């Protein structure tokens, strides 16, 4: 069985190493990851330059392939070119910091899992809910458990799961919850600075905050209660409940471009 492992924190990230150590107990794992940190690049892919790929080593042994592109690039090239056998599962992580709510859109970690599902491979993204002093031990163990679960029920299916593990002692984790993506978002602030040559620059800062309208079945809410959140995600971004209303409103307008009416139905 072949697992493709990637992340957005870079090929030498501790979270990826912990993931490999645990998942390699069950499967032949191939690491294909960005050569440097590519956090918050979303689902970007590289079109304007070639992807450079190099074999990397750790302690004298082959570690994996470092790619000059994004996490989504890594999944594409890993599945299509670098794996000499079919990939059965894509696992992205372990990310340092939670990926919940609207911030999922920005996440390279989650986008890597989404890309795997687009390519027809079951996938999961796993993140740890802390930005400092991360202990990946339990998150890696849970990733192994979920990998077994996915291979049992979703083998060869285009499914993607976004998993967030609270950064708590194991005994304090209050179980898991199947959740939906919530409304938590980054509350932006900018750190304004001036360099030695008097040039102005900014660092994007801020922190993720739960929305006042956050429902108890959301990913961010579960994580805040000390639970593991497991969210099925999908790349179709259509808002289906708005289709009929939009059609009705547009049908009333006469000032739009003079094109033939079409309801896009067969």
From Swiss-Prot:
The keyword Cytoplasm is annotated on this UniProt entry: yes
Record note on cofactor: Binds 1 divalent metal cation per subunit.
Keyword annotations: Cytoplasm, Hydrolase, Metal-binding, Nucleotide-binding
GO cellular component labels: cytoplasm
Binding site for a divalent metal cation: 8-9, 39, 95
Coiled coil: none
Cofactor: a divalent metal cation
Listed transmembrane segments: none
Listed EC numbers: 3.1.3.5
Keyword set includes Transcription regulation: no
Molecular-function GO terms, alphabetical: 3'-nucleotidase activity; 5'-nucleotidase activity; exopolyphosphatase activity; metal ion binding; nucleotide binding
Class of the enzyme per the UniProt entry, highest EC level: hydrolase
Location (main, coarse): cytoplasm
Highest taxon of the lineage: Bacteria
Biological role: Nucleotidase that shows phosphatase activity on nucleoside 5'-monophosphates.
Similarity comment: family membership: Belongs to the SurE nucleotidase family.
HAMAP family, sorted: SurE
Protein name: 5'-nucleotidase SurE
Organism: Syntrophus aciditrophicus (strain SB)
Chain's gene name: surE
């Amino acid at each position: 069985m072949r697992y493709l492992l990637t992340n957005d924190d870079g090929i030498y990230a501790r979270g990826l190493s912990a993931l490999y150590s645990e998942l390699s107990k069950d499967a032949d794992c191939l690491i294909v990851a960005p050569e440097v940190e590519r956090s918050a690049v979303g689902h970007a892919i590289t079109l304007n330059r070639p992807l450079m790929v190099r074999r990397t080593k750790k302690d004298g042994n082959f570690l994996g392939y470092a790619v000059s592109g994004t996490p989504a690039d890594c999944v594409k090239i890993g599945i299509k070119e670098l794996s000499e056998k079919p990939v059965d599962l894509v696992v992205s992580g372990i990310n340092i910091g939670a990926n919940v709510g609207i911030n999922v859109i920005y996440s390279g970690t989650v986008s890597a899992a989404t890309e795997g599902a687009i390519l027809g491979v079951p996938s999961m993204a796993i993140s740890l809910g802390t930005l400092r002093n991360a202990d990946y031990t339990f998150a890696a163990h849970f990733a192994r458990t979920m990998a077994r679960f996915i291979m049992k029920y979703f083998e060869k299916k285009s499914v993607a799961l976004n998993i967030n593990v609270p950064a708590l002692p194991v005994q304090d984790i209050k179980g898991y919850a199947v959740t939906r993506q919530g409304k938590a978002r980054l509350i932006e602030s900018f750190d304004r600075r001036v360099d030695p040559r008097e040039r102005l620059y900014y660092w994007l800062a801020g922190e993720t905050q739960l929305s006042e309208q956050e429902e108890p079945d959301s990913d961010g809410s579960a994580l805040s209660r000390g639970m593991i959140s497991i969210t099925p995600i999908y790349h179709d971004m259509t808002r289906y409940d708005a289709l009929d209303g939009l059609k009705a409103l547009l049908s009333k307008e006469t000032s739009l471009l003079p094109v033939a009416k079409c309801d896009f139905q067969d």
